[in-house]
Every structure is written in C-alpha cells, then in structure tokens.
Amino acid sequence: MNQSFYDKLTSVIAKERVYVDEPMSRHTTFRVGGPADFFVTPKAKEEVRDVIRICKEAGMPYYIIGNGSNLLVSDAGYRGVIVQIYKEMNEVKVEGDLVKAQAGALLSGIAAKALGAELSGFEFASGIPGTIGGACMMNAGAYGGEMKDVLESVTVLTGKGKIIELGRNELELGYRTSVIAKKGYIVLGAALKLERGDGEKIKTYMDELKEKRVTKQPLEYPSAGSTFKRPEGYFAGKLIEDAGLRGFQVGGAQVSEKHCGFVINRDHATAADIMELMRQVQIRVKENSGVDLEPEVKRLGDE
C-alpha cells in the first residue's frame, strides 16, 4: 500500500470511509470486478473536491462511480482511487415544484419522493437502476422520457476544482451525452423541475412501468442495464436476436433469453467472460445486419 498517499486521503476524509484493495464486485450491479487500490465514500461535496485535488497532486488515477450500474470493472481491478458518490450523499428534498437531490440519490428514491409530493414528470426514471449523478452525465432515459425533459440545473465540480451550477441551457444534453461528460465534470447535485399532478395517476403510471420492466427485463440476474446503445433507426436487442444470439453464452455470461438487449451474469461470470461475450455479439451483429453496436456499459481497469 502507498502509505503516504493513504495518509493524504485520510487527512480530508475519515479513515472508516477509505478502503484499501476493495473488491469492485461488491460495488457494481454486474457483481464482477477485481480490487481497487483505494475506494473512498465522501459525504459532502467539499470532500469530493479535496479527494480529487489530492489525486491530481499525486498523479493518482481516479474514477467516479454511483451505485455501480452501467459499469464493467476488469477482473484485475483498478489501479487508482474509486470515488463512490452514493449512500453518503443521497439527500433529496422538495421545494415547491423543484426536487433537489445530491448526486448519490437513486433515481427510484427521487421518483418516490416526487410521488409523495404529487409531482409528475419523473415517472419514467423510477426503474432506471442508477443515481442521479450518472443520469445527468449521460442524459439517461426510458419509456419516452429523458433527463433533459426535467433538469433545471446541475451542480458540478470542474477540472479546475471549482464548484459551479449549470443551468438547463448550459447542459448540452443529447442521446446519452452532456457537457458534463464532454468536459469531465463531476456531478454533485441536481434540481428537477416537475409539474403538479394527481398522486393516484402518478402511482398508477409508475406501477405500469414497473410491470413492464419485471415482465420484459431480466431483473432476477445481475446486469449493468442495457448493454449497448440504441443504433439510429434500430433496437439493439432486436439486432442481437436477429443474429441468433438469444441465450448465447460465454463462461458465466449470457445474452438474456428474456431481453436480448441485456447481457447478464448468469452463473459466476468474470469480467473477461462479459467482455468476450460483448465482443462476439458485436462481431455477429455486424456480420448479420451491417450495424456497429456501441457499448453503453463503461469499461474500467486493465484487461
């Protein structure tokens, strides 16, 4: 262990929230991934800022995660610092028609809070398995809704260590992208502008979406969510199915039989199994339909 670097980290964040050689399989929804050299869980935006400053000063690589959805960490793990903005930074509060959330708040929890306040517009996100930090960065969406429809502002940490607020017109939100992703900003919090609605109708709609997910998505197995981005004019799952890959397996990883757009950890898969399966899917889909599938899942660590 790099003791001097550990000492620097623990000068800005409590020791009980600094972990050494932490298995990433505990922190990703795929349930795979080797150890991160350091794993920290800040509980305030100032702690995030200070940890990043220390990493930069030491030339230490770092990576920000939320609840570990949409992420594939290699079996070798990560040589650097994983900064998890999740349970220690997940406060949500309602102010009129605004819902303000820290970056680690789960989308499902924010949707529940909005429902409790009879605010409509965020139902689409109630089943997306991620935090609002990641959702802002990639303009997450489902069932016809996207973050860009409801985001009022986002508080970020810039590359120069400044904490600033970006208004909706500054966010440059597109399909699975934003100015946050383009500039490498770190999301610290967000404000959503919603509309007054009927609590019963909001709940009914959320229940309908939940039923769709349970019926159509392989929620009973670990996965990272949708594995590939939607190619323009196509659906990734349909292209994968048309290539004859429903149920296709490499080691413990499998193309879900329930929904071909999902790669699942069927049986003690390794990250290498999942990566090879994704590679094979890309090759077969390209051969069958001529379409290049681009991963939606982020890869991290040495292969």
Please place each PLM-identified region on the residue numbering.
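Short Pro/Gly-enriched beta-strand edge/turn motifs at strand-loop
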Residues: 135-138, 173
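Phosphate/pyrophosphate- and phosphate-bearing ligand-binding catalytic cores of soluble enzymes
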Residues: 19-20, 71, 157-276, 283-284, ...
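Short, solvent-exposed amphipathic alpha-helical segments in soluble enzyme
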Residues: 55-57, 245, 280
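Anion-binding (especially nucleotide phosphate/pyrophosphate-binding) glycine-rich loop
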Residues: 2-132
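Alpha-helical scaffold segments in soluble metabolic enzymes
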Residues: 8, 50, 109-113, 153, ...
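Structural signature of FAD isoalloxazine-binding scaffolds in flavoprotein oxidoreductases
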Residues: 33-34, 40-45, 72-90, 137-168, ...
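Conserved active-site and cofactor/substrate-binding residues in soluble primary-metabolism enzymes
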Residues: 4, 25, 43-46, 105, ...
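Short, basic and Ser/Thr-rich N-terminal targeting/leader segments
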Residues: 58, 65-67, 150, 221-222, ...
